[in-house]
Amino acid sequence: MATLIDILLGVKLQNCDVDSTSTEKRSLSKVRSNTLSSAEAAFCMHKCFLDVLKSKSAVIRSATYSLLTSYIKHVPHVFDEETMKKLSPTILGAFHEKDASCHSSMWDTILVFSRKFPEAWSYCNIHKVVLSRFWNFLQNGCYGSKQISYPRLVQFLDSIPPKAVMGQQFVFDFLHNLWDGRNQRQLSAADSLAFCIAFKHIFLWLLENVSRYPF
């Protein structure tokens, strides 16, 4: 939590008033430098927070996803090749997270990571680690987070590098598993609405991006 506050403080410092005096600017620059140093040290000390993501506490896992998102946005230089090899399977394969209370922060991390580091997809077994878990996630109705997860599906599709997946088979599997998740017995009106809206947006997105998935 302290590290997360440090990261957020660093973001605030970036947005300080441009009319600040030179003394204030020097002070703020020093604070920012110290903030980045602390963030880098914490990232290394806690081994990319991989162990924390395995916590039995959903609150801790959710906070860790948020923390990683802050790092990706504001301290991206800590994600070197070795770090990417360790983190890519964990972040892109995070769909085995079954606690719906974690899904909002989980999605933020996945989307920001995939957009910021498209090369990350080359550091993991896409079909075994990412897609198999993603298909299970969809089949199980997003483990109870339909209203959170369905609106993010188009963003996820858009973030996947075209070369990372097999076109025709990927689209078929995606729609098949998405529909399977829709056929659950208990589906609220809000869940049904979220599904219908998401399905429409997905269909339109696929039409607009058909060249990414050659048939």
Regions found by a protein language model. Name each.
Residues 4-12, 53, 64-75, 95, ...:
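Hydrophobic residues within the alpha-helices of tandem HEAT/HEAT-like
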